[in-house]
């Protein structure tokens, strides 16, 4: 079985969760349009890089998780690898 893979070369903005998720959605839609079964994004795509002190804020990490869950709900028909921070367990 062959799988077509899209590698997203994106430039996310640090701290702009909504904007970065919207950018990811555009890449995902384009990858689906081109018949890809998987799209891979860069490290910390969702929160931007380098997030530095933002990672010390519990609220920011919670917002990242909510944004990631919304993005996952909106994604159908393609596998997505996307970088996002997570709170320690």
Across the structure, where does each feature detected by a protein language model lie?
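Hydrophobic structural segments
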Residues: 1-89
């Amino acid at each position: 079985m062959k799988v077509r893979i899209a590698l997203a070369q994106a430039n996310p903005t640090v701290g702009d969760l909504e904007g970065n998720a919207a950018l990811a959605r555009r890449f995902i839609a384009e990858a689906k349009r081109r018949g890809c079964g998987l799209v891979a994004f860069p490290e910390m795509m969702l929160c931007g890089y380098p997030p530095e002190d933002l990672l010390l804020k519990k609220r920011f990490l919670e917002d990242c998780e909510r944004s990631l869950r919304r993005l996952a709900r909106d994604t159908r028909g393609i596998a997505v690898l996307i970088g996002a921070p997570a709170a320690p367990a």
